[in-house]
A protein has these predicted regions:
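Short, acidic/small-residue loops that bind anionic groups at enzyme active sites
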Residues: 29-30, 34-37, 124-148, 152-155, ...
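Accessory alpha-helical/coil subdomains and C-terminal extensions
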Residues: 99-100, 108-113, 119-123, 151-172, ...
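Short glycine/serine/threonine-rich phosphate/pyrophosphate-binding segments
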Residues: 12-22, 43-44, 76, 91-95, ...
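Short beta-strand segments
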Residues: 6-7, 36-37, 69-70, 111-113, ...
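Glycine- and acidic-rich phosphate- and metal-coordinating loops
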Residues: 277-285
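A cross-family phosphate/adenosyl-ligand binding-site feature
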Residues: 1-8, 16-105, 112, 116, ...
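Flexible loop/turn connectors
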Residues: 298-310
């Protein structure tokens, strides 16, 4: 058995742990493993297939990033090409990818990725490519699994940043607005905001009223608390407003969210007169060594993916259900983002602690 491994989309702490688990689990079954570099680019645009043995994955569990590299621009169904004038256009090269996969003599693919990669894998599976998926995103927004690796590390990083903002905000009697990743799901903002004792948490799932946000800050001021911490998810939006974008979808790309923290900070300063600063934590949330939880989850996902291949359970994704690793059909995963339920215990906890959610 020859299996290929690919990592697509944004990087997340724990990717290397998955790769190591797949390679080791395959090795002890007598199988050979190969890595496709930079997502599917290693099959489509250059000779990027590398053997992965015990030596190649030794000592990588604790490393952030991915030893295979990754990209957000390698969708074979929307592959970016350029004409003679240098203008970019999209072309469907999925058949080329399947042909290259077969020509390489692979028997199965372990695709590690988020919602975009899962959609690609589903469409490739429908073309006959034998694939098993491992969910990967710091956003924790993939349906079919209660947790994705990378999320715990991102929350830890964000919480540490919020902790540090408290001292500078209090020293200057300022309002600090920190923008966190998550795209259209507020998991990172909710978990880190709650853990970091934020005063306001703004989520994509709950459109906010800026006056409600300012009212919370005024009440703290009246109580002698002359600083406030506002945590805002990048996909949060005001009532009757739109999501802030840094860049709209172009050829081979998706919308880039961002800018809401600056907008909220300006509004707070205008309505309250309080000196307000904004901070975008950005890609720090993707970096660093994975937490113990993320390492363990990634290792479990990787070994479960190999077991799925052994059972020829292609067209599935491994996921966490309760305390067990399960398999979910890709057709029941794609196009079904998992957002924060409005009645979940964590939301209720935030409200019970007096945290404003802007509504």
């Amino acid at each position: 058995m020859r299996i290929a491994i690919s990592t697509g989309g944004g990087d997340a702490p724990g990717l290397n742990a998955v790769i190591r688990a797949v390679v080791l689990s395959a090795h002890y079954r007598g199988w050979k493993s190969y890595g496709i570099q930079r997502g599917y680019e290693g099959l489509l645009s250059f000779n990027g297939v590398v053997p992965l043995g015990l030596a190649e994955v030794r000592g990588i569990t604790h490393l952030g990033g991915t030893i295979l590299g990754t990209t957000n621009h390698g969708n074979p169904f929307r592959y970016v090409m350029r004409n003679e004038q240098g203008e970019a256009y999209e072309q469907d090269r999925s058949d080329d990818l399947v042909a290259a996969f077969q020509a390489s003599g692979f028997d199965a693919l372990v695709s590690i990725g988020g919602d975009g990669s899962l959609q690609i894998s589903h469409d490739l599976w429908r073309k006959g490519l034998p694939v098993v998926c491992v969910p990967k995103t710091i956003d924790n927004d993939v349906s079919g699994t209660e947790r994705t690796f990378g999320f715990d590390t991102a929350v830890s990083t964000a919480t540490e940043a919020i902790d540090k903002l408290h001292s500078t905000a209090e020293s200057h009697d300022r309002v600090m607005v920190v923008e966190l990743m998550g795209r259209y799901a507020g998991w990172i903002a909710l978990y880190s905001g709650l853990s970091g004792s934020a005063d306001v948490i703004l989520l994509p799932e709950i459109p906010f009223d800026i006056e409600k946000v300012c009212d919370k800050i005024r009440r703290r001021e009246a109580a002698g608390r002359h600083f406030s911490i506002v945590v805002v998810a990048e996909g949060a939006r005001p009532k009757d407003g739109s999501i802030e974008l840094l860049e709209r979808r172009g050829v081979g790309t998706v919308d880039r969210l961002g800018g809401i923290a600056s907008k909220v900070a300006r509004a707070i300063e205008h309505h309250t007169g309080k000196e307000t600063r904004s901070l975008v934590l950005g890609h720090l949330q993707r970096g660093g060594s994975p937490t113990t939880y993320d390492r363990l989850l990634a290792l479990r996902f990787g070994s479960a993916a190999v077991r799925a291949i052994a059972d020829r359970a292609f067209g599935t994704m491994v996921g966490l259900t309760g305390s067990d690793i399960s398999r979910v059909a890709l057709e029941n995963v794609v196009g079904r983002a998992w957002n924060v339920p409005l009645n979940c215990d964590t939301i209720r906890t935030a409200r019970d602690l007096g945290i404003s959610l802007g509504d």
